[in-house]
């Protein structure tokens, strides 16, 4: 890089960190999420009260832990136990980037029996789990919906513990899974704007939160937050057809805002709420047809191109 006089300037260093606090269900316990990108930053020796679960997403980091050195590279998972001193910094000149979550120990005991889990190896190679953790972290950092956070993070942490710790897994089969799912569906649909936490539902059913999640997934094939989002989309359709605007509809069906509604509406139906409303309102003969997201992108890409003579 050069300035106006032609002198070489050093590259801009990136030292970025952003904290997001998600809540696991309505009035539930907090779960802190860190998104970090550092070129030179080196942590002082420290410890956390929580388990630190990190996924490296760029560069490489050297972590001093338990008297040794861990080298985290993209796709690797690092698990640091509560109360254990560690530090970290760049392994090379390209810095390092990672996503981390800070989980109370109780969160990692829901899918096991006996003593709390112990991770003999702090550096884990599990590409599928790393990708799932990264995706959940990214999406919940952008829009920390309580039910979605409670549906996704305890499930992923259970997978982490069951695959990689010394703890003994709890039973997989949940008797009466269909009945459990029916109760959960009814409660979520009945309290659309402020759904109950899964922890409270599990207590009412005499289950752990992990057992409730497993039962629901067994019966429905999707987690509770995804079922509720689809139910909200169907309710939103009816309200849009009645003439209400997307911004009004979002709050009425329990989405955080119009952007949250739009994200799920497109996932389920392939179009935006505004486009759907335009197409289905009564008396709008000749209205533009509803286009899928791909068709909308194609039309925008083609706008402005000269038309060929016929």
Where do the language-model regions lie?
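N-terminal regulatory/effector-sensing and dimerization cores
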Residues: 16-117
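Helix-turn-helix
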Residues: 201-209, 213
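Solvent-exposed, amphipathic alpha-helical segments
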Residues: 128-142, 180-191, 235, 239-242
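Sigma70-family region 2
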Residues: 87-91, 163-164, 217
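Terminal helix-turn-helix DNA-binding modules in bacterial transcription factors
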Residues: 186-190, 194-199, 207, 218-258, ...
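Amphipathic alpha-helical segments enriched in hydrophobic/aromatic residues interleaved with Lys/Arg
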Residues: 112-171
């Amino acid at each position: 890089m050069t300035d106006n006089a032609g002198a070489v300037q050093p590259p801009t260093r990136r030292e970025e960190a952003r904290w997001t606090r998600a809540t696991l269900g309505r009035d539930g316990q907090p779960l802190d999420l860190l998104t970090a990108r550092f070129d030179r930053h080196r942590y002082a020796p420290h410890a956390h009260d929580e388990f630190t679960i990190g996924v490296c997403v760029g560069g490489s980091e050297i972590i001093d832990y338990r008297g040794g050195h861990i080298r985290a590279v993209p796709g690797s998972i690092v698990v640091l136990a509560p109360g254990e001193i560690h530090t970290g910094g760049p392994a090379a000149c390209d810095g390092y980037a990672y996503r981390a979550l800070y989980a109370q120990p109780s969160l990692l005991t829901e899918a096991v029996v006996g003593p709390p889990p112990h991770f003999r190896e702090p550096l884990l190679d599990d590409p599928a789990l790393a990708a799932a953790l990264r995706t959940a972290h990214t999406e919940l950092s952008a829009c920390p919906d309580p039910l979605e956070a409670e549906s996704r993070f305890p499930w992923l942490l259970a997978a982490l513990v069951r695959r990689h710790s010394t703890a003994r897994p709890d039973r997989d089969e949940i008797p009466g899974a269909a009945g459990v799912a029916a109760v959960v569906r009814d409660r979520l649909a009945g309290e659309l704007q402020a759904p109950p936490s899964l922890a409270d539902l599990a207590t009412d059913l005499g289950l752990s939160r992990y057992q409730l999640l497993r039962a629901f997934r067994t019966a429905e094939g999707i987690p509770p937050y995804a079922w509720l989002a689809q139910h909200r989309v169907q309710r939103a359709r009816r309200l849009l057809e009645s003439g209400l605007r997307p911004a009004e509809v979002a709050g009425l069906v329990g989405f955080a805002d119009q952007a949250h509604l739009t994200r799920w509406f497109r996932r389920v139906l392939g179009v935006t709420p505004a486009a759907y409303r335009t197409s289905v309102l009564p008396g709008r003969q000749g209205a533009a047809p509803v286009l899928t997201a791909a068709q909308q992108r194609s039309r925008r890409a083609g706008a402005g191109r000269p038309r060929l003579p016929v």
